[in-house]
Every structure is written in C-alpha cells, then in structure tokens.
C-alpha cells in the first residue's frame, strides 16, 4: 500500500473522517465505507484518487477544493454522492460513475470547470439541484440505456418526467431546440452555455427553473411559450447579449434577479397579469430604456437599480408610496419620475 496509516483517520465503523497526507496518488484503504463530511477538503496535492469496493457513501463536501484532482480511477462501490462532494475540483476532466451509484446530491460537481465528459449508470434515480452547475467545459453526458429515470439525447440530459436536466455548456453549437414534450427546464439547465445564440422552446413548456440561462452570455433573444407560468430567480441573469425577450401572458410575477446584468436589454413589455416585480429583477440592465406593465402592486428593492438609461416605466397602476422597494429605482435615470410619462 502506498499510503502510510497516519494519512487517514478512520473510525471503527469504517468512516473516514479526515485525510492528512500529501501524496499525489491517493488510494483509500479497503474497509472504508464512508467518506466523511469535508474529509479531504482542500487536499490540493492529490491528482489521482482510487476508492475501495467497500465504499458506499461520499459525504457532503467530501473532496471539495481538491483543485489538482484530475482522475478518479475508481469510485469503488459508492451508492450515494453527497451535496458539494466534488465542489471546485477544477482539474477533474472525466467522470465515469460505477453501476452502483443511485444518488447524486445537490451541486455535487459544482465548479468542476474542466469536466468534459460525464457517464451516468443504470441505477441512478436522483440528481440534486444544480449538480453540474459551473461545469462550463462539459461537452457530453452519457446515460446507460437501461436507466429508467434519465436519458440523453445528443449528449443533453433529460429525465423521463419531461424535464431537461442539463444542456452541456461546452458544446460548440450556436443554436439548440428543446424537443417537444419537455415541460420543465431544471435549475441551471442552460447555465454558462456561452456558445448559444438561439434556443427554441416547445409549446409544452410550463416552467423555467432558477438560473436556467444564467450566464448564457451570447443568447440574443428568447420567446417564452404561452404555457409558461413559473420562472425561477436569476433565470436569465447575466445574459449580457439578451436584447429581447417575449414573456407569456400567464406570467404574474417577475422573480428576483430574473434579468439582472442583462446589459443588452433595451425595452421590456410585461404581460398585463404581472402584479409583482421581484427584488433586483432588472438590476444593472444599463441599456434598458422603457418598461411597460399592467397593474403593478409590488416593486421590490433595487428592481431597477443601476438602470442608467431608464426613461419610462408605464403601467395602468403603480404601487402606492411604501409598497415599492425603498431603492427600487436607485441610480436609475428615471429616479426623479419613476412613474414614467
């Protein structure tokens, strides 16, 4: 065995609670059944990892911050990968999960910036929210054809309940059309898809998740289908090139930070049913000139903050003083006359 025993702190029950070694090639001893929370946190010298067949659980943040880790030679017999387990493993290039894996926790591979390929097994039944957020180099997801919960089409990950789970942001395509029948875009589904200029959405779509298009910075325009009634916070945040968005008639709320940092957005027409604009919804939309709305009841804090080009906010009704955020129009050019003309 290449490791000295003092490198690992293992309980009698087989839980590895901490690693104190400095090796580049780390082989976790046979008999370990669980990697404890933050056990390998910041083990920056580790480049290669081998896990034993006895392993069942990788705890939350287990290998987070292992920024030199390039290869997991074996995941052993792991069934459960905890939240943020491989957070910010920025050198990790490929992940081939074993047939035993059933669950991937929320943000498990968040920030794995060079991860290019991901293989998911037959047994997998649960993928947590934003499990692959920040994997901006991801080009393809492969799923076992025997998996009953998930499948891939042209390298894009879907579940069998009608949700697009993850579009690989490292693909070099300029356009993508979501297939008919998809009714939901998962949280972070298209986040950091920086090559995309156009995305076609199906009429079946009803929900757009939190941060769904976050930092899709070359996306130019988007038409949301009429059935969409739910849009998550930050859904279009930091889409710098987004100049036009068509919003559906059934929308009642613009969520917090929905369009923050959309520097190319110039004019927005809100559907007549929208009564609430969330906090920071248009924060930093520096080219935004006009907003047309219906009967607004609530305008959140900083909703139009730093909208330096804003000249007009027109609505059939606007909130009384005190029902809009104290800094809703802070630094906006329309601050002196936020009700527009």
Task: Map each language-model feature to its residues.
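Structural signature of tandem-repeat unit edges
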Residues: 1-14, 20-34, 44-57, 67-80, ...
């Amino acid at each position: 065995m290449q490791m000295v025993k003092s490198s690992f702190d293992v309980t009698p029950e087989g839980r590895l609670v901490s690693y104190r070694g400095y090796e580049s090639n780390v082989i976790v001893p046979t008999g370990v059944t669980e990697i404890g929370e933050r056990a390998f946190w910041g083990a920056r010298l580790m480049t290669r990892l081998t896990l034993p067949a006895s392993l069942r659980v990788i705890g939350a943040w287990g290998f987070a911050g292992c920024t030199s880790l390039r290869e997991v030679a074996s995941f052993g017999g792991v069934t459960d990968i905890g939240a943020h387990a491989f957070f910010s493993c920025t050198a990790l290039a490929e992940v081939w999960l074993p047939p035993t894996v059933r669950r991937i926790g929320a943000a498990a591979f968040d920030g794995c910036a060079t991860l290019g390929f991901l293989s998911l097994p037959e047994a997998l039944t649960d993928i947590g929210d934003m499990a692959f957020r920040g994997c901006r180099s991801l080009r393809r997801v492969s799923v076992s054809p025997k998996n009953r919960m998930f499948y891939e089409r042209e390298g894009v990950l879907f579940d069998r309940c009608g949700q697009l789970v993850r579009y690989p942001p490292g693909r070099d395509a300029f356009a993508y059309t979501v297939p008919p029948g998809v009714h939901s875009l998962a949280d972070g589904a298209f986040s950091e898809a920086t090559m995309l200029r156009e995305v076609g959405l199906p009429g079946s779509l009803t929900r757009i998740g939190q941060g769904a298009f976050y930092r899709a910075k070359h996306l130019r325009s988007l038409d949301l289908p009429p059935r969409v009634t739910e849009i998550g916070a930050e859904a279009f945040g930091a889409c710098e090139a987004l100049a036009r968005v068509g919003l559906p008639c059934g929308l009642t709320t613009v969520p917090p930070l929905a369009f923050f940092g959309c520097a190319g957005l110039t004019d927005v027409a809100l559907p007549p049913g929208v009564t609430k604009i969330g906090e920071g919804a248009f924060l930093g939309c520096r080219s935004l000139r006009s907003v047309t709305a219906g009967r607004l009841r609530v305008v959140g804090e900083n909703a139009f903050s730093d909208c330096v080009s804003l000249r007009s906010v027109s609505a059939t009704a606007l909130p009384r003083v005190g029902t809009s955020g104290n800094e809703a129009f802070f630094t906006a050019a329309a601050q002196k006359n936020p009700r527009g003309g």
